[in-house]
Amino acid sequence: MSFLDSVLKAFVGDKSKKDVKEIQPIVNKIKALESEFEALSLDELRAKTSEFKAKIAEATKEVEDKIVALNKEADEIDDITRKEDIYAEVDALKEKSYEISEAVLNDILPEAFATVKETAKRFVNNTQLKVKASSFDREISAEKDYVTLEDDHAIWSNSWDAAGKPVTWDMVHYDVQLIGGVAMHQGKIAEMQTGEGKTLVATLPMYLNALTGNGVHLVTVNDYLAKRDSAWMAPIFQFHGMSVDCVDYHRPNSAARRKAYNADITYGTNNEFGFDYLRDNMSHAPDDLVQRPHNYAIVDEVDSVLVDDARTPLIISGPVPKGDTHEFMELKPAIANIVEVQRKHLVKVLSEAKKLIKEGDTKEGGFQLLRVYRGLPKNKALIKFLSEEGIKQLLQKTENHYMQDNNREMPKVDAELYFTIEEKSNQIDLTDKGIEFLSGKDEPDFFVMPEIGMEIAKIEKEGFPAEEEAEKKEELFRDYSVKSERIHTLRQLLKSYTLFEKDTEYVVIDNKVKIVDEQTGRIMEGRRYSDGLHQAIEAKENVKIEDATQTFATVTLQNYFRMYGKLSGMTGTAVTEAGELWEIYKLDVVEIPTNRPIARNDKEDLVYKTKREKYNAVIDHVTDLSNAGRPVLIGTTSVEISELLSRMLKLRNVPHNVLNAKRHKQEADIVAEAGNSGIVTIATNMAGRGTDIKLSKEVKEAGGLAIVGTERHDSRRVDRQLRGRAGRQGDPGSSQFYVSLEDNLMRLFGSERIAKLMDRMGLEEGEVIQHSMISKSIERAQKKVEENNFGVRKRLLEYDDVMNAQREVIYKRRYHALFGERLRVDLANMIFDISESITETNKAAEDFKNFEFELIRNFSMSSPVSEEEFKKMNAQKLAGEVYKSAYKHYDEKMSHNAERAFPVIKQVHEDERNNFERISVPFTDGTKTLSVVTNLEKAYETEGKQLIKDFEKNITLAIIDDAWKTHLRKMDELKQSVQLAVHEQKDPLLIYKFEAFELFKVMLENVNRDVMSFLFKGEIPSTGAPSIHEARQTKSKEKVETRKEEIPNMDERAAQSRAAGNTQRQQPEVTETIVRDRPKIGRNDKVTVKNVMSGESKTMKFKQAIPLLDKGDWVLVEE
């Protein structure tokens, strides 16, 4: 604890003690009820649940009844304004109902918690529990073997199978667990040390919040924990008639998964919850939805999910046109060559630098050393040399000298290099020498971007004929886009060769490149690096290069979890991230005291000069511990190190298991053995692992589990997770971290102070230092990294907040269209918006002719006012007249369509040979035709009105989805292009917000116009009955995939743009990929066009047709 912290504690008091003190009275109430609940029979105990539910129902009855009455009224009336008011009132009442039920939950909390605790006690004290059988008992006895029926009784066993592992219930909630349960119900994060039974604590708030019937989600980091915990805890809930399910057992979009979400309590992984939300917002029928509104979630390992995973958005993507065209394999040999040339050159430079420094020429030696560091920072010989006395300081001093005045002198250092590497920001740049080397003598301009502005001016000066000038400009733009893509490909290939190491950042399994999670050491199935980096690594490793994809739907985990009415979490390590959790999620962290004092011995770090010495010391220590009969858990940060230590232990004949990303399938078996005497387990990062390590009596006597950390992690929290695997529930144990000056953390973020300190102490090779001052310096370095990462996540969230606001608007509209109840209100608003837009633009220009034309184009109707009235009226009144007239016209049009369709529907319905459930009816607007599926029975009963409702729903959904996909692509491109704003000393985020708003406004206007245009013009073709046929139930599914993107941080993006700006400074433009939706037509090709108003057709050259097509009243007829 820092000095400042201890001073603050003395004056302000200890936050964790305050938090516990506030909760203690509630815990006392729960304990006071214990004797009363012990006296209850099993049936009386079970009746408590019905009693609680009745209390909630009674309290919310008045509000719920009002909601039902208002919805009924809205269905029966046609007045759009009244409908809108009703829906606003319904939304407000739903909020009120939620608040009332929350107040009731707070009142019944002591009794509800006492019920769960007493249930746990009964399961511990009885092998069988005999109760009067309910219908739920009968239902569950058919599925689960721990419930059997005997006459009209049900017998519950206290032993069952928890995801393949037999368990006998042996847990009752301690007082500290009750405190944790209360904190979680209040929407806070309970920090409980490992082994304090977080899984059991969660049963308390889950039972309480499930009483409302709105669903409770428990979110875990992996499917093993989701499946295990759901099976382990289920009987406690099921005994009280609550249904429990786990989404990871069922296929996406299936009826079984919908049933899992409809259960009272639902377990699952964060990814699946997020992907289901996205899939729901891509569905085309209400029956396809699986999730209910987001009510209450408890996130297990909350820091891992909300902090570590926050930089990785969930993405559903699909194929992009020409997604398989790239130049990775063509450019790969050149990159492999340039990397090798630079490596050979810098090896010589390094030996020259060593020689100069040895001779005392530190100026020139430092200069050469910096050059090597700029070109190959991960070179092993360089890292070893930097651990020698005074060398790290010399490098830092030289770097500071050349970095002053905004890197003014740095080009001197980089002059001999082909490319430079900024390891801290993961950034790489080609130098002029590198570009020259890659271009070769034959094509000097192979990588040089044309200066667009200058080139266009040149073309215009030449005075070419209009057609030729257009061709030349087209060619220039083509050349620009090919070269910018080529430079991007090149950069990503360079990055893959110099910054991404196999078996550290990724592994290759089954000829596929798979990312290793730096936090947990697990393989991230289905995740890909974005921005072409993954394809570059695939090219480097000679495996199949996957096609590029386009985003169809995306959400970050941060914004997904913020949708819940109430969010809480539990973890062993959140205090270090408490500031971030409060700032982003408004989640307070409550430290829960341990049930028994921690008996683990946490030793100060041992610091060595080189990695080699450090690993030798680790192996010596581990061998001694193993011989003493203690189990040892070695934590490593990469697959490569875990395999190196495994080889070293083999040479010493020490029996051991390795648990890393390559062996994740054997995880449960390895962890089960890890607590046995003398067993050594090597694991890559332990977040969420090792929860099942149990120690025998002999092991406890020998000193318990020994934790050996081979390196300090970037985050203090991950180190605490590793430490926490020992000393559970007051067991003995120890933890020891080994550090070397060559470790990444020390190299990148270790201060000059540590280097000076080591030199002052005269650390010789093989010697070790153990001092609290060193440990504090390491912690400071970790804090630096954490602050850096927090900045990145916060920046990312600010970008995503813009998307989130837009996503909410679009998904709300989609939801209304999907269910159709509020769609008429949305459509009326669309008509009003278009009316206002037409009126404002034409009134300002006093252009009555264009006003008439736009009304015909958008609403297929003539002007409701004369030219004289148009000139006299103000814009607001005129817009109102247009809206009234357009809405009346729309209403009549839809009634006419229903009347026209009904005779055919009647004929199909009354023909006894047809036993159709759903029929497909074609609608056309004169150019496009769309088949609308509707329920035949409902269409018949409503005299065709149901068909019109389905027509409105289908058109709105189809147009929104299409526009949203295109918009997402534009937003991706905008995010890339705004980074160039740094050249003009502007904040890219501000420009992004402004441009994104403009893009979204234009998209919404286009959606409104496209939807209304089709609805006003759309009608059933006059061919009649033959065009109506049975709708088959086959769903044509788009080929989509789900993945989590590893995205470069904003610093990287800005650095990339700065590099781009060095070659060319120009206005940041928003680039947009144009995707053709029709074949390319030559200017002199003959085409046929048709007038949508009169139906007249003409054949002419395409260049003559362009002005007509641009006006919008002529369309191209595809032959």
Swiss-Prot record:
Main location: membrane
Reaction(s) catalysed (UniProt annotation): ATP + H2O + cellular proteinSide 1 = ADP + phosphate + cellular proteinSide 2
Membrane topology: Peripheral membrane protein
Residues covered by region (Disordered): 1025-1081
Keywords: ATP-binding, Cell inner membrane, Cell membrane, Cytoplasm, Membrane, Nucleotide-binding, Protein transport, Translocase, Translocation, Transport
Enzyme class: translocase
PROSITE patterns given in the database record: SECA, SECA_MOTOR_DEAD
Subcellular compartments: Cell inner membrane; Cytoplasm
Tree of life domain: Bacteria
Pfam families, alphabetized: P-loop_SecA, SecA_DEAD, SecA_PP_bind, SecA_SW
A GO BP entry: intracellular protein transmembrane transport
Biased composition (Basic and acidic residues): 1029-1055
Biased composition (Polar residues): 1059-1070
GO cellular-component term (any): cytosol
Enzyme Commission (EC) number: 7.4.2.8
Binding site for ATP: 177, 195-199, 692
MF annotations from Gene Ontology: ATP binding; protein-exporting ATPase activity
Subunit organization: Monomer and homodimer. Part of the essential Sec protein translocation apparatus which comprises SecA, SecYEG and auxiliary proteins SecDF. Other proteins may also be involved.
Similarity-based family: Belongs to the SecA family.
Function summary: Part of the Sec protein translocase complex. Interacts with the SecYEG preprotein conducting channel. Has a central role in coupling the hydrolysis of ATP to the transfer of proteins into and across the cell membrane, serving as an ATP-driven molecular motor driving the stepwise translocation of polypeptide chains across the membrane.
Record protein name field: Protein translocase subunit SecA
Gene name, Swiss-Prot/TrEMBL: secA
